[in-house]
């Protein structure tokens, strides 16, 4: 914090010296020194963006590519929602293999749709953009992600068992007209964060960080750390 300007005056002297702090705001504030007032905060409009979510520009690029691939314009949104719903079942990482062909893409496989997306942004960023749509879709049909049990989720948290769950409440995502059917509960958010932590920990345990391949160092292990050694403190249940 900048200290206020100080004024000193020698005893018996009529001359005063004013010392200004380097970071002090000029008396006449304009340009980048303009001080905002209440009107600004009540009328200003901010464009929400997140580096975890595909941008509108990204979607425009993907839309153009899909048009060239002959994805029907009138069902293109549904093709996107179907792909993202599929990713809620199988995952949205770069290594995920898409299965089959959705009903809205004119026979174009989900794998080809995903490949086109990856030329513009990550598959997870794309899925994050539509996370609220998929959340409502799953709740409406009482159809949680297919692998919720395999991921260790409890039945009461099963709708949070997908790896782009954070997009449900991200303001940069596309929100259905009626909003969320219900917001995620604190327990669901905690379960999703815990699952993400466990997945990262397991992946770290599979990596090899040995500086030497000598058996005295590796002890015969291929990976550098066991899962048990990699796990630190998990969040409370």
From Swiss-Prot:
Pfam families documented for this protein: Flexi_CP (PF00286)
Location of the region described as Disordered in the Swiss-Prot/TrEMBL record: 1-28
Compartments (UniProt record): Virion
Q: Which domain of life is it from?
A: Viruses
Keyword annotations for this protein? Capsid protein, Helical capsid protein, Ribonucleoprotein, Virion
Query: Which residues, by range, are in coiled-coil regions?
Result: none
Q: What does this protein do?
A: Required for genome encapsidation. Forms ribonucleoprotein complexes along with TGB1 helicase and viral RNA.
Family (UniProt): Belongs to the potexvirus capsid protein family.
Q: Does the keyword Ribonucleoprotein apply?
A: yes
UniProt KW Ribonucleoprotein keyword: yes
What does the entry list under GO cellular component? helical viral capsid; ribonucleoprotein complex
Family matches, as InterPro entries: Pltvir_coat (IPR000052)
Instruction: Drop me one GO molecular function for this one.
Output: structural molecule activity
Please identify the protein, giving its name as recorded.
Coat protein
């Amino acid at each position: 914090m900048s200290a206020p300007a100080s004024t000193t005056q020698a005893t018996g002297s009529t001359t005063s010296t004013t010392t200004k702090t380097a970071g002090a705001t000029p008396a006449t504030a304009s340009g980048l020194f303009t001080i905002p007032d209440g009107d600004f905060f009540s009328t200003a409009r901010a464009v929400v963006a997140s580096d975890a979510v595909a941008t509108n520009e990204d979607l425009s690029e993907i839309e153009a590519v899909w048009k060239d691939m002959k994805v029907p314009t009138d069902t293109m949104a549904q093709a996107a929602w179907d792909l993202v719903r599929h990713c809620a079942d199988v995952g949205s990482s770069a290594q995920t293999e898409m299965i089959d062909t959705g009903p809205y893409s004119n026979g174009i496989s989900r794998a080809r749709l995903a490949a086109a997306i990856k030329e513009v942004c990550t598959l997870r960023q794309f899925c994050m953009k539509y996370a609220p749509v998929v959340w409502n879709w799953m709740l409406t049909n009482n159809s949680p992600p297919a692998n919720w049990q395999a991921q260790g989720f409890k039945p009461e948290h099963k709708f949070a068992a997908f790896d782009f769950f954070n997009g449900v409440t991200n303001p940069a995502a596309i929100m259905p007209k009626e909003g969320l059917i219900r917001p995620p509960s604190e327990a669901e958010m905690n379960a999703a964060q815990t699952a993400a932590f466990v997945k990262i920990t397991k992946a770290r345990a599979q990596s090899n960080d040995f500086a030497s391949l000598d058996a005295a160092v590796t002890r015969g292990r291929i990976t550098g750390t066991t899962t048990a050694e990699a796990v630190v403190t998990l969040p409370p249940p």
